[in-house]
Amino acid sequence: MKVVIIGGGAAGMTAASRIKAIKPDWEVTVFEETNFVSHAPCGIPYVVEGISEADHLMYYPPEFFRKERGIDVRINAKVIEVGEGFLRVRQNGRESKYEWDKLLIATGALPKIPNVKGSELDGIVTIRHPANAEKLKRIIDEAKNIVIVGAGYIGVEMAEAVSSLGKKVTVVEFLDQPLPNLDKEIANLVKAEMEKKVDLRLGEKLEAFEGKDRVERVVTNKNSYDCDLAIVATGIRPNVELAKMLGCKLGETGAIWVDEKMQTSVENVYSAGDCVETKHMVTGKKVWIPLAPAANKMGYVAGVNISGGSLEFPGVVGTQLTKFFELEIGSTGLSEKMARSEGFEVRSTVIKAKTRVHYYPGGKDITLKVIADERGRILGAQAVGSEVAMRINVFAVMIQAGFKTKDVFFSDLAYAPPLTPIWDPIIVSARTLKF
């Protein structure tokens, strides 16, 4: 059996490893267009900041997969054509044809490039792939005045990274808040923290990049900002071109449609990772939420099913986490505005608390917002402050399990004065929402 995987990222390498574990005699080939496999794009800002090196964003190098797992990993190998039972690959200037019995498309996502005047100028960069992280760091090191376009997760993380290097940083965002998936009460706390470190310009639409051969300023509908480097962080899109070439159905989100077993609409063709849509476990609707934990699990599920097993991917609740300097930021499930747009009758609460009992030193602030429907079912949670990750993860599990406020209130959470308050913010939120 010949299995071919297009894309050596999280989903692709997880699937390849699972297939070889189950079917060690099968021939598994991975084509990756860069020289990085099993990579962690989420770590790019921390390479830029100098916290890590680009090579460390690979969990294992290609040689590990070849020697230890028997996977034929082809790097710097770009798939240029795919058809029924075959594909064509360009590698080292040569084109070759390969056959497959089963195919996994794990092509990930691509950065969105704004269609504005001057977008072809030098000095305009996107955050795409760990293979380019070291080059990106060198470019940023040479710049002094940087404009970041977009205040989503990538924009916020890059704002921290480059301002930590002593650069002058301006962040331009079309919407009236950073991190648009957050509700206003929580986003305003992020906004206040960002304004201490960078020049944050909200409600401004990008209109053009200007300069001779290299970008010299970013122009919006309200202002223009001089710069010697522009970082574009205006979002990403699913990389679906090869799937379309093969005739795979695209879903309503524009990403590749798959069933719960990661099978596409084409027989013997699977897809996983940031290029596919999945189900939201709160609404039951199809969503495209490209995040690394889901991509890894999708790859695992695809690997099991390609190998003849039976495993279903249940969907996601969209759990996300980041930070801006000392401020941790997390969310899971639906925001209040999302819940209302989905037709839920919403109850919500915002609480401010400490992370320790009052008499023990070291307690820090956390602000938590929890959203429930009229029956008390937890729909979503958001938090900013300290020790956010644990609480958002707890809520993610509660949302998946269908907890109501009463279930949350009676959850037997751990307590110790040096570590947690007796009334954890999670419990207080349920008490405030009532049941």
Label each residue range with its predicted role.
Residues 5, 9-13, 35, 109-111, ...:
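Residue-level detector of alpha-helix initiation sites
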